[in-house]
């Protein structure tokens, strides 16, 4: 049965923007940083790529870039393959679980890695899994290369009132934007996917594999992530952009 892949991708983008009104600004910062640190023709890993929201923007902004897009979700990967494509060989779609070692060997087939990017994905790894993940990642990125992560990262344990105020302001801002630009929620988008006959097999495979994503958001995760990156061997680590708890963390290898 035919699937309107382009329409599903547009709906995905709309529901993501529903939760992240400043999503495009965050993408802009990440891609600009990529260009400034490793140039305009980088070899990039997109870790937890989903349907390629970031990968597509990277190759559109930096036509000489090559992106190795890795995700464990079979439905979102197929959405990327069908709706985004390989952009003339610039994007390669790979199914692999970042919690396991197999993705590292697959990434090595892409050749030397200048940079790795991730958006709104690594909170699905526990702190222990993150530490192992960063150690493996440090072994892939060339010296002078960069890792850039965009995600919601909580304030520290001794900043609880600051964190609560930031979350309240962020929810208020997101509510205003959602009222001005109505869109499906995350749950509504997935419910619609489940009712699409042409996506039934992929949705069933996804359910059998995941059942539900774990969420390891916790107080202090921003500082904990930076400490794990330093321990893994990254030489410079810091936050380059922040809007409430929405941050871009950068680590130079």
Question: Residue ranges of each PLM-predicted region?
Answer:
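A conserved beta-strand element that flanks and buttresses the S-adenosyl-L-methionine
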Residues: 117
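Short alpha-helix
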Residues: 217-232
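A short glycine-rich, Lys/Arg-flanked "PGG" loop and its adjoining helix->strand segment in the class I
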Residues: 131-143
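Core SAM-dependent methyltransferase catalytic element
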Residues: 235-253
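Class I SAM-dependent methyltransferase SAM/SAH-binding core
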Residues: 45, 55-102
């Amino acid at each position: 049965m035919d699937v309107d892949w382009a329409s599903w991708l547009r709906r995905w983008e709309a529901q993501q923007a529903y939760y992240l009104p400043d999503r495009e600004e965050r993408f802009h910062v990440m891609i600009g940083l990529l260009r400034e640190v490793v140039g305009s023709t980088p070899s990039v890993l997109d870790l937890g790529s989903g349907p390629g929201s970031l990968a597509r923007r990277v190759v559109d902004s930096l036509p000489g870039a090559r992106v190795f897009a890795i995700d464990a979700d079979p439905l979102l990967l197929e959405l990327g393959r069908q709706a985004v494509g390989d952009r003339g060989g610039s994007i390669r779609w790979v199914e692999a679980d970042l919690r396991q070692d197999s993705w590292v060997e697959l990434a090595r087939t892409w050749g030397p890695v200048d940079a790795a990017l991730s958006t709104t994905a690594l909170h699905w790894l526990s702190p222990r899994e993150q530490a192992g993940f960063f150690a493996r990642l440090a072994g892939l990125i060339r010296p002078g290369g960069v890792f850039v992560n965009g995600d919601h990262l909580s304030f520290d344990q001794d900043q609880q009132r600051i964190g609560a105020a930031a979350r309240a302001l962020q929810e208020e801002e997101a509510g205003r934007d959602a009222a001005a630009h109505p869109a499906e929620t995350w749950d509504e988008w997935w419910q619609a996917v489940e009712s699409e006959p042409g996506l039934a097999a992929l949705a069933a495979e996804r359910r059998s594999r995941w059942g539900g994503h774990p969420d390891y958001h916790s107080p202090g995760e921003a500082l904990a992530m930076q400490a794990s990156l330093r321990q893994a061997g990254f030489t410079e680590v810091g936050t380059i952009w922040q809007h409430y708890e929405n941050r871009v963390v950068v680590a130079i290898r």
